């Protein structure tokens, strides 16, 4: 997701 490691 946008704020966690690009997941």
UniProtKB/Swiss-Prot annotation:
Coiled-coil regions listed: none
GO CC aspect terms: extracellular region
Keyword Transmembrane helix set for record: no
Keywords on record: Amidation, Neuropeptide, Secreted
Residues found modified as Leucine amide: 7
Keyword Zinc-finger attributed: no
Subcellular localization(s) per the UniProt record: Secreted
Main localization (coarse): secreted
GO BP, one annotated term: neuropeptide signaling pathway
Entry function: May act as a neurotransmitter or neuromodulator.
Record family assignment: Belongs to the allatostatin family.
Name of protein: Carcinustatin-4
Origin species: Carcinus maenas
